[in-house]
Regions:
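Short, small-residue-biased leader/transition segments that mark boundaries at the very start
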Residues: 1-2
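NAD(P)-dependent Rossmann-like dehydrogenase/reductase catalytic/cofactor-binding core
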Residues: 11, 19-29, 37-124
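A non-catalytic, amphipathic alpha-helix used as a structural packing/dimerization or gating element
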Residues: 6-16
Length: 124
């Protein structure tokens, strides 16, 4: 239901963190940025998408990982992104909410409601 908002705001957060780390702004509008994000978010074969959907339905982190023989990069990357956002004093609401769902047992429905109730502002 909120897929377009999450993808758009998610790209903004990824870009914000990447630029803080010294990345080129243009990287995020090309194949390795938005191109990869679109495939990850829309492909039925994406481990990260499937794991995220399961997380959103209430499955716990450890339950999800038990079913994968390969790495679900998004889970580990979420932990690193939160640490980096704290280091650079960045406000990354999606990353923080996902982290709370993954590692602090926050209800995913509450996390989504909090994200969608945020004030609208420029995402460029």
């Amino acid at each position: 239901m909120y897929k377009r908002q999450i993808i758009t705001r998610g790209l903004y957060e990824i870009k914000k963190l990447g630029i803080a780390l010294g990345a080129n702004h243009d990287t995020f509008t090309g194949l390795s940025g938005i191109g990869d994000l679109i495939v990850t978010c829309t492909s039925n074969h994406s481990r990260n998408r499937n794991a995220g959907e399961r997380l959103g339905k209430g499955e716990k982190y450890n339950q999800i990982l038990e079913n994968y023989l390969m790495v679900v990069e998004g889970f580990d990357n979420c932990e690193a992104a939160v640490k980096l956002s704290n280091k650079f004093n960045l406000n990354l609401p999606i990353i923080n909410q996902v982290h709370q769902v993954l590692f602090q047992n926050k209800d995913p429905k509450i996390a989504m409601t909090e994200l969608m109730n945020r004030s609208a502002k420029s995402e460029i």
